[in-house]
């Protein structure tokens, strides 16, 4: 199977699209859109779907259970281009992130991000390998597209936006990792979404600057505070977990109420939030 990517530079101008990536897609590679439900994934999906044929697109999401913002999967489904399938990559054990944290007796941190490896990257790569094997029409070729941007952090600025994934390029697979919007600024991301006639996930309008776990180890103080206000029931669960394991979510080693200034939510708070 081969195809030709339309050379509409206006429509693809926000994307980083090296010649090698274009040629690989034209050879019929599957393009997997790693979708968190956040603004960057959404903008990436809009841009990539403008020039990659629909039958070569697949969206994949790693559900995070109770720590995920409500409505995330529905938001992804509502904003995907028609005809693009969505697969959900659950953890192999079925255990939630909070259960994994309690087992380990500690929260993840910047150097030990088992939240990413155990609940996102590992399950997603597993499901993509399965999908590729079940669909031989792609010839074992896959591009894993992710929405990381250089502006987000010094570490992400150093990421290579197109590279061969040697760890997954085996057993008849040829796998490349692609960061199509690596060079975009935050304003560009929201512009792309608005120009497509879409809105970002509701949590942004509610005051969050990022959409990850509701209480993320990398979140700013303001995001943690707003999350505590928006999800009092889950906030109470995190505080109780901190006390049980004797470890804090914040790298400052301050308990959440000291970080956010928000007292523990009463037991009558909505348990679904």
Placement of each model-derived feature along the sequence:
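Nucleotide-activated chemistry modules centered on ATP-dependent adenylation/adenylyltransferase
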Residues: 1-273
């Amino acid at each position: 199977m081969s195809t030709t990517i339309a050379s509409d530079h206006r429509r693809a101008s926000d994307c980083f699209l090296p010649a090698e990536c274009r040629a690989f897609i034209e050879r019929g590679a599957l393009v997997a859109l790693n979708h968190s439900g956040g603004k960057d994934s959404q903008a990436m999906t809009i841009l990539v779907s403008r020039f990659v044929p629909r039958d070569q697109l697949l969206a994949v999401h790693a559900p995070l259970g109770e720590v995920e913002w409500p409505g995330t999967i529905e938001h992804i489904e509502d904003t995907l281009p028609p005809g693009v399938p969505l697969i959900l990559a659950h953890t192999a054990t079925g255990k939630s992130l909070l259960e994994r944290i309690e087992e380990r007796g500690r929260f993840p941190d910047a150097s030990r991000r088992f939240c990413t490896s155990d609940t996102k990257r590992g399950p997603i790569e597993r499901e993509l390998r399965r999908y590729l094997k079940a669909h031989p029409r792609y010839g074992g070729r896959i591009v894993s597209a992710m929405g990381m941007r250089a502006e987000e952090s010094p570490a992400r600025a150093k990421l290579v936006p197109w590279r061969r994934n040697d760890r997954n390029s085996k057993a008849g697979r040829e796998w490349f990792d692609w960061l199509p919007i690596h060079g975009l600024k935050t304003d560009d991301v929201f512009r792309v979404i608005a120009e497509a006639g879409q809105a970002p996930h509701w949590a942004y309008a509610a005051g969050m600057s990022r959409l990850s776990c509701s209480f993320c180890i990398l979140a700013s103080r303001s995001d943690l505070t707003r999350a505590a206000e928006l999800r009092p029931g889950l906030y109470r669960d995190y505080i109780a977990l901190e006390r049980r394991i004797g470890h804090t979510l914040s790298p400052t080693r301050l308990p959440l109420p000291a970080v956010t200034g928000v007292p523990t939510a009463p037991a009558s708070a909505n348990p679904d939030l």
